[in-house]
């Protein structure tokens, strides 16, 4: 059992503003990559979910709290875990750390939708994969 997924990010100049601080919207890209890698680590992909089940994952809600800025050449660790799973959605908690100290906290609600954009039941293989990252 995994319980939480870890993903490392190195901050490059392209990620920062003119002051060398990570531009706020770039944190969302880092979080997306970490969530995707969490799912990929179980053998699933977004393309597989679409081809096998006709579904994909969308972000319904994102709450983010920037506690301390990341800067040029920092190495960050993103910890991702599943807080809860319902029939059509799941909640992920993500923590970004620098040197083992939390600098950003995010909580997202993700919904499974069909090709018409309507919420639909989470496929069993995805549900089983998500459970590996829940407490």
Q: Where do the model's predicted regions map?
A:
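Generic structural detector for well-ordered beta-strands
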Residues: 8-12, 65, 109-111
